């Protein structure tokens, strides 16, 4: 049995390229001896995530010191802590919350203006979104929205009615609410993707920061928590070489699997929504950081879809563990995809 989990995440490369290497070495911003919730205990047990917490503590203090409305900002932070704690022990969820919040804090003190271009905060490049708002008179707001969900996309234009710190839009079964959150804009959607003019799995909800350009993306295996440490990430880069990026391009949806042969290993089936026949992979991490990876690759002038298999373990270089074999058979679907055993 597998449990699917969609992870709408993306990070800012400008911020994390500078800070990521130091994350694992930093302690959390709170006393781990007093950690009470599952999320706090998970943070304290994982040095990389604890480092993100430390960075957030510093960014929070600096942002609060410059806030024009400290009370509103504290309320917002308390709400964020509630959302963080909903992750419980899920490291991918926790890392995504922290990375997203670090981006938000960079923009949260920017003076709010309905006349702006906005980018959706997301750790994954597969869930980017852009919103352009223009105020037309005292009570109306025109908007132009676009968003991605895996390889699918959506776009919507309309006119919303402004009341105080919110604007609302309703047409048939599509309802949007635009809410001011300090210097940010929060979009809430009611109605499914098709009702709002979008492809399968595409939604406009989320927090948007004022920026005329797309947020720099620094999406890696650490962001997804497929690897735990910088050392493991470097091992994966060395093993996969150019296919490290192929692996990242293989997943907007993640599903957990189990292996009878690799006791205690974490196996993650991943695929790109809308392009699962060409963009998919399985990533297996052993209890000591061993790696087994199989991924789809489009090769040659005929765009043949092949499977490339990598592992750090010499004894597995020429055979597939059970969970990888099952993935390979499922992806082949009777057509027997060519299998390349990579060195």
Locations of regions flagged by a protein language model:
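Amphipathic, heptad-repeat alpha-helical segments
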Residues: 31, 39, 43-72
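Tryptophan-anchored aromatic micro-motifs
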Residues: 110-131, 171, 204-235
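Short, surface-exposed coil-to-beta transition loops
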Residues: 125-131, 152-157, 171-175, 202, ...
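N-terminal glycine/threonine-rich, aromatic-flanked beta-hairpin/loop signature
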Residues: 126-162, 233-260, 265-268
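A short, surface-exposed interaction/processing loop segment used at functional sites
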Residues: 195-197, 204-205, 285-332
